[in-house]
Design a protein with these regions (language model features):
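Acidic, glycine-rich flexible loop segments
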Residues: 126-151
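Edge beta-strand at a domain terminus
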Residues: 95-102, 143, 151-220
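N-terminal glycine/threonine-rich, aromatic-flanked beta-hairpin/loop signature
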Residues: 50-119, 123
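Bacterial N-terminal signal peptides that target proteins for export
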Residues: 2-11
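Short, solvent-exposed loop/turn elements at domain surfaces
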Residues: 30-32, 47-52
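N-terminal helix-cap/turn-to-beta initiation motif at the start of protein domains
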Residues: 25-41
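C-terminal motif of bacterial Sec signal peptides marking the signal peptidase cleavage site
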Residues: 20-23
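Hydrophobic beta-strand residues in large extracellular and virion-surface proteins
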Residues: 38-40, 60-64, 74-78, 116, ...
Length: 220
């Protein structure tokens, strides 16, 4: 279920942000650009396909800073988090199995913790005055590293990820809570399908344990 990221490691190294436009309040006459600096976050969901492929979709966070007055050079700090097993075997704990009539019951315990799986600092990006909404990253051997800022939606798009600005309602804890719900739904659905196809049929009774202490540690 929660194996290490395979295809997203390269994405962690190249995800970068660019320009943020300030939103207008309902009573405001004019808008003002907030500039490129800021913290952004993205999570695109966890589905049965993630379970089947053993590839997780992490929560990505990036912090963008302008490095010159003209704001054409940026550096970005990037992090990626997902839930990893904390058991020595790095897999669910089988607590018990028993036959109940013709059906086998298996009790599983998923013991996991939100874990920092990728961190990269001071990634350099450049934008041109003729196209300020695109930042080209200085990263070797990785194609399609342009990041595009959409001023209409105030989002950053790169590959399959859409980044939104970090806020009180859109932050690591909020998305971690969403991740936990998605993970349980997807895993239970997958186990149901596996159990129905097994011989004898197996009913998985699953409990989940999520440790989010890394979030509290980061706030200290």
């Amino acid at each position: 279920m929660l194996k290490r990221i395979l295809q997203y490691l390269s994405l962690c190294i190249v995800l970068v942000s660019l320009f943020i436009l300030a939103s207008c309040s309902s009573n405001s006459v004019s808008s003002q650009s907030k500039g490129p600096e800021g913290e952004w976050i993205a999570y695109s969901g966890y589905t049965v396909q993630n379970v089947v492929s053993a590839v997780d979709t992490p929560i990505f966070i990036l912090n963008v800073k302008a490095r010159n007055d003209s704001k054409t050079i940026y550096t970005v700090d990037m992090k990626a988090y997902n839930y990893q097993y904390t058991t020595p075997e790095k897999r669910p704990v089988i607590e018990s199995t028993q036959m109940v009539g013709d059906i086998k019951e298996a009790r599983l315990n998923y013991i996991t913790a939100l874990t920092l799986v990728m961190s990269a600092n001071d990634i350099i990006g450049n934008s041109e005055s003729s196209n300020p909404n695109t930042i080209k990253m200085d990263i070797r051997d990785i194609p399609n590293t342009d990041l595009i800022y959409d001023s209409k939606t105030d989002t950053i798009k790169f590959s399959d990820q859409t980044f939104k600005r970090v806020s009180d309602t859109n932050n690591l804890q909020t998305l971690a809570d969403a991740y936990k719900k998605d993970l349980q739904v997807a895993s239970n659905k997958y186990l149901e399908e596996v159990g129905n196809a097994a011989n004898p049929k197996t009913k998985f009774i699953t409990t989940y344990s999520f440790d989010d202490s890394i979030i509290k540690d980061n706030k200290k």
